[in-house]
Swiss-Prot record:
GO terms for cellular component: cytoplasmic side of rough endoplasmic reticulum membrane; cytosolic ribosome; cytosolic small ribosomal subunit; nucleolus; small-subunit processome; synapse. Component of the small ribosomal subunit. The ribosome is a large ribonucleoprotein complex responsible for the synthesis of proteins in the cell. Part of the small subunit (SSU) processome, first precursor of the small eukaryotic ribosomal subunit. During the assembly of the SSU processome in the nucleolus, many ribosome biogenesis factors, an RNA chaperone and ribosomal proteins associate with the nascent pre-rRNA and work in concert to generate RNA folding, modifications, rearrangements and cleavage as well as targeted degradation of pre-ribosomal RNA by the RNA exosome. One of its GO terms (molecular function) is structural constituent of ribosome. GO terms for biological process: erythrocyte homeostasis; ribosomal small subunit biogenesis; rRNA processing; translation. There is a cross-link at residue 103 (Glycyl lysine isopeptide (Lys-Gly) (interchain with G-Cter in SUMO1)). It comes from Rattus norvegicus (Rat). It is found in: Cytoplasm; Nucleus, Nucleolus. This is Small ribosomal subunit protein eS17. Coiled coil: none annotated. Keywords: Cytoplasm, Isopeptide bond, Nucleus, Phosphoprotein, Ribonucleoprotein, Ribosomal protein, Ubl conjugation.
Length: 135
């Protein structure tokens, strides 16, 4: 079992990453020097632990978003994804095939006026109510 990191190490590393993300990388030694320059860390041991956790978090950030850390670049990326508008709307197709239940739901949602809806009978799927052992 590995060592447990204290909340001091974790909080310090998160704050350092949020403020100085552009100066940090995947290399422990460069991160150690950056931590030494930007923060007053009382001991060498604590500095090394913080730099190690910063390096660990930087590797995780490259794979995807990390909980508890908000970086401007990630915020902008998330914003762009949320505001995405497709080139062609799903409703702009010539004919949209729907089953009768879906047609009723669309009518209740005031989408009954869509002219390109074509009601089709649902295809019968597998019958799951056969007794076990019957072939």
């Amino acid at each position: 079992m590995g060592r447990v990191r204290t909340k001091t190490v974790k909080k310090a590393a998160r704050v350092i990453i949020e403020k100085y993300y552009t100066r940090l990388g995947n290399d422990f030694h460069t991160n150690k020097r950056v931590c030494e320059e930007i923060a007053i860390i009382p001991s060498k041991n604590l500095r090394n632990k913080i730099a190690g956790y910063v390096t660990h978090l930087m590797k995780r950030i490259q794979r995807g978003p990390v909980r508890g850390i908000s970086i401007k670049l990630q915020e902008e990326e998330r914003e762009r994804r949320d505001n995405y508008v497709p080139e062609v709307s799903a409703l702009d197709q010539e004919i949209i095939e729907v089953d009768p239940d879906t047609k009723e739901m669309l009518k209740l949602l005031d989408f009954g006026s869509l002219s390109n809806l074509q009601v089709t009978q649902p295809t019968v799927g597998m019958n799951f109510k056969t007794p076990r052992g019957a072939v």
